[in-house]
């Protein structure tokens, strides 16, 4: 049966176009539309949609308030539409905090002109969120989307991704069963996409100010959003969190968030490292791209890396993680049950690259134990 969708927006044009696009996919069906948050709350309870697309700025009741009420009364996967502005970014992060699972930039021109990429992206996101029921606090997984058309190995060049021996199967673990390896690290990498903002906040807020290593964060996010996200994390965390700037020298206890619309790489400079922020190849689907950052870290730091792949659509991170593992690095993945979308972690785990599959609730403790100086 088709996934039932409720479309919520105060613009009649946007409601109509989103409905048309959703209904073009035989796996999706718009069952109703609403023009404000109050209508959305009522319809969510009465119609039991499997996915809701939600605008933020609406009369009567705004989207953020509607998300809070829906998640309290009848939890439903919600995809937010957000303007590409500083205020829009802050509001979107508030909506994610309230319980929304994902967001898309609200680009009227792309929607109006039937741009193929925009249509496919909207359909993929709605299907990804609608393929499972939502339970709180644990969210059930979805099916991953296809692999990006360009891998980091082809863009960076010179690093084989197929030279390692067949790895052992991934083990599903809880923090209590994870014993620190005693390995000495110089860098922590975390890559994520759908569901990442909430997951990163949950993990990083548990880190002490004296966390012993630099941290590179790669979150699929537009350029207008990453400054607001970095600022929000910095205000919530004991460690410092900043949007990465080209030339940043890596410091322990500091997390560097890859800027949206750019690629973040790292190079070795003596005992530490330095961030390189580049426009990157137009061939890459993702900017920032987890594969790009992971692959550069494999060259710069070799096996002295702990890399974690969190919830997200697609397979970004798999090839970069393969390079890291070939260099001797440790690779972990978020487990299926705690992912918003089990795509990126599944790609790493099913390829035998990840040595541990860890729940989000236990991830911070596990990282801290593994990272401890000993």
Curated annotation (Swiss-Prot):
Q: What does this protein do?
A: Involved in chemotaxis. Part of a chemotaxis signal transduction system that modulates chemotaxis in response to various stimuli. Catalyzes the demethylation of specific methylglutamate residues introduced into the chemoreceptors (methyl-accepting chemotaxis proteins or MCP) by CheR. Also mediates the irreversible deamidation of specific glutamine residues to glutamic acid.
**Where found, per UniProt?**
Cytoplasm
The reaction(s) catalysed by this protein are: [protein]-L-glutamate 5-O-methyl ester + H2O = L-glutamyl-[protein] + methanol + H(+); L-glutaminyl-[protein] + H2O = L-glutamyl-[protein] + NH4(+)
Please give the Gene Ontology molecular function terms for this protein. Answer: phosphorelay response regulator activity; protein-glutamate methylesterase activity; protein-glutamine glutaminase activity
Record remark: domains: Contains a C-terminal catalytic domain, and an N-terminal region which modulates catalytic activity.
PROSITE patterns membership: CHEB (PS50122), RESPONSE_REGULATORY (PS50110)
Report the principal subcellular site. cytoplasm
Q: Can you cite an annotated GO cellular component?
A: cytoplasm
Query: Family per UniProt?
Result: Belongs to the CheB family.
InterPro entries linked: CheB-like, CheB_C, CheY-like_superfamily, Sig_transdc_resp-reg_Me-estase, Sig_transdc_resp-reg_receiver
Response regulatory domain location, by residue? 4-121
Q: Which residues form the active site?
A: 193, 220, 316
- Does the keyword field hold Hydrolase? yes
* Cross-referenced SUPFAM superfamilies: CheY-like, Methylesterase CheB, C-terminal domain
E.C. no? 3.1.1.61, 3.5.1.44
Q: Please describe the post-translational modifications of this protein.
A: Phosphorylated by CheA. Phosphorylation of the N-terminal regulatory domain activates the methylesterase activity.
Q: Which terms are listed as keywords in the entry? A: Chemotaxis, Cytoplasm, Hydrolase, Phosphoprotein
Give the taxonomic lineage as stored in the record.
Bacteria, Pseudomonadati, Pseudomonadota, Gammaproteobacteria, Alteromonadales
The protein's name in its UniProt record: Protein-glutamate methylesterase/protein-glutamine glutaminase 1
What's the gene? cheB1
Where does this protein have compositionally biased stretches of type Low complexity? 138-155
| Enzyme type, top EC level | hydrolase
Residue intervals of the CheB-type methylesterase domain: 181-374
Residues bearing 4-aspartylphosphate are: 55
List every stretch annotated Disordered.
138-177
A GO biological process of this protein is:
chemotaxis
């Amino acid at each position: 049966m088709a996934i039932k969708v409720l479309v919520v927006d105060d613009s009649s044009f946007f409601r109509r176009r989103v409905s048309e696009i959703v209904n073009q996919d035989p796996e999706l069906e718009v069952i109703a539309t609403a023009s404000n948050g109050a209508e959305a709350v009522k319809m969510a309870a009465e119609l039991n949609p499997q996915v809701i697309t939600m605008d933020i700025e609406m009369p009567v009741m705004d989207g953020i308030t509607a998300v809070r009420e829906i998640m309290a009364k009848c939890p439903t996967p919600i995809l937010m539409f957000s303007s590409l502005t500083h205020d829009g970014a802050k509001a979107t992060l508030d909506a994610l905090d309230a319980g929304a699972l994902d967001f898309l930039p609200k680009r009227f021109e792309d929607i109006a002109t039937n741009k193929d990429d925009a249509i496919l992206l909207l359909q993929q996101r709605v299907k990804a969120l609608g393929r499972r029921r939502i339970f709180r606090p644990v969210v059930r997984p979805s099916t991953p989307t296809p692999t990006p058309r360009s891998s980091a190995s082809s863009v960076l060049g010179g690093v084989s991704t197929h030279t390692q021996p067949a790895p052992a199967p991934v083990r599903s673990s809880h923090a209590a069963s994870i014993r620190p390896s005693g390995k000495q690290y110089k860098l922590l990498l975390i890559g994520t996409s759908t569901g990442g903002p909430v997951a990163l906040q949950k993990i990083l807020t548990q880190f002490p100010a004296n966390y012993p290593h630099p941290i590179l964060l790669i979150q699929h996010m537009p350029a207008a959003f990453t400054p607001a996200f970095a600022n929000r994390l910095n205000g919530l965390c004991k460690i410092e969190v900043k949007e990465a700037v080209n030339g940043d020298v890596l410091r322990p206890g500091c997390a560097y968030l890859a800027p949206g619309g750019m690629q973040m790489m790292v190079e070795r400079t003596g005992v530490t490292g330095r961030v390189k922020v580049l426009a990157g190849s137009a061939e890459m689907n993702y900017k920032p791209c987890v594969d790009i950052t992971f692959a550069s870290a494999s060259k710069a730091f070799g096996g002295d890396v702990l890399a974690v792949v969190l919830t997200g659509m697609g397979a970004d991170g798999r090839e970069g993680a393969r390079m890291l593992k070939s260099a001797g690095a440790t690779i972990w993945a978020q487990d299926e049950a705690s992912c918003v979308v089990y795509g990126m972690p599944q790609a790493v785990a099913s390829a035998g690259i990840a040595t541990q599959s860890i729940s989000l609730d236990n991830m911070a403790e596990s990282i801290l134990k593994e990272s401890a100086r000993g």
